[in-house]
Regions:
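A glycosyltransferase accessory/donor-loop signature
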Residues: 1-4, 10, 166-324
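N-proximal low-complexity "stem/linker" segments adjacent to membrane-targeting elements
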Residues: 1-23
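Short, acidic, metal-binding catalytic loop of nucleotide-sugar glycosyltransferases
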Residues: 24-33
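Short internal beta-strands
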Residues: 35-42, 130
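Active-site-proximal specificity loops/subdomain of glycosyltransferases
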Residues: 48-49, 55-95
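GT-A fold catalytic core of metal-dependent nucleotide-sugar glycosyltransferases
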Residues: 66-72, 86-136, 151, 156-159
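Conserved nucleotide-sugar donor-binding
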Residues: 156-168
């Protein structure tokens, strides 16, 4: 029996975005006989849960399982901000399911194709597989990595739960949080990279097509972040032209549920949100001044000027991080 196990985490406010992601996933993956959708439930209202269950009833191969966030808090045994606690709780996976493999997906995504090839990826020789991200060097060093290590974005991850349990990854996560006095650079993403750094598989970028892939060329990303190992331009082109999962990271474009969003695949999100039981109501707002300035520099200056400004910003971020 072909069974797909997927994990999301949300509260009531983010549930409509998760619903759009789930609907797109189910619409493109009818080939699976069973799809288990696990949701870490951070006080989702009964009304919203009912809407989600009603939506899933349209698909005869899907089941949604809510797991209360409150049950995971005691296991963390740390004092932290709400944001970080929810993020870290995602990795208490042995509490949530007894399956041997699970696919974690962020709520701010749309699935645009079959997940069969991704799900069937051989991860027997690693703990986690994901798409490479490009943090600044100080962010890598903050979690015990260096420029030669390949750091992944935690928005889409295929996780080997069998090895996860055998290597006591959850205990290592808690230990790392304690060693960093509750603050780990990039929160849950930094944690997963720091703990699993010697057991990470890199996936094709089409499985987590992030905003920077639409903006920057491969050689620009390598230059900007001083990366030794990265995707080819052909791989990035394929990810942009035929993404399997679109990840609406809040970079230059903004989130697709804001009226100012300029993401080239924003309409795909709107299309799937309309198929859910939730109202399509774009939020009014304005991008942060700092983002607008960076965007202006990127669009109206030679790339080396933009790169210089980003390096200056990274120095400021590094100083700020050391104060925390």
């Amino acid at each position: 029996m072909s069974r797909l196990n997927v994990l999301y985490a949300t509260d009531t406010n983010y549930a409509p975005h998760m619903a759009a992601s789930i609907y797109s996933l189910l619409e493109h993956n009818s080939s699976f006989e069973k799809i288990n959708i696990y949701v870490i439930d951070d006080s989702i209202s009964p009304e919203v849960k009912e809407k989600l269950c009603t939506m899933l009833s349209e698909f005869n191969n899907a089941e949604i399982i809510f797991y209360p966030f409150e049950k995971l808090q005691p296991k963390l045994k740390i004092k932290e901000t709400w944001f970080a606690m929810v993020g870290y709780a995602r990795w208490m996976l042995s509490e949530i399911t007894e399956e041997d493999k699970i696919l974690y997906i962020d709520c701010d995504t749309i699935v645009n194709g079959s997940l069969e090839e991704l799900w069937n990826t051989d991860i027997s020789d690693c703990i986690v597989a994901g798409v490479q991200d490009n943090p600044a060097l100080f962010a890598l060093e903050a979690v015990g990595m260096n420029r030669n290590d390949r750091y992944i974005n935690s928005g889409v991850m295929l996780i080997n739960l069998k090895t996860w349990r055998e290597q006591s990854i959850e205990e290592k996560i808690i230990q790392m949080i304690k060693e960093h006095n509750g603050f780990v650079m990039h929160h849950d993403q930094g944690i997963i990279n720091g703990v699993c750094k010697n057991s990470i598989k890199i996936l094709h970028p089409k499985y987590n097509t992030m905003s920077q892939f639409f903006l920057l060329k491969a050689k620009q990303i390598k230059s900007l972040y001083d990366i030794n190992n990265y995707y080819t331009q052909e791989e990035l082109d394929e990810a942009v032209s035929n993404p399997v999962i679109v990840h609406y990271i809040n970079k230059f474009y903004g989130r697709p549920w804001f009226d100012y969003c300029s993401h080239p695949m924003r309409n795909l999100y709107i299309e799937y949100l309309k198929k859910t039981p939730f109202e399509v109501k774009l939020k009014k707002g304005k991008q942060k001044t700092s983002v607008r300035i960076r965007k202006f520099v990127f669009e109206h200056s030679p790339f080396f000027i933009y790169a210089l400004s980003e390096r200056i910003l990274n120095i400021r971020r590094k100083v700020k991080a050391k104060r925390q």
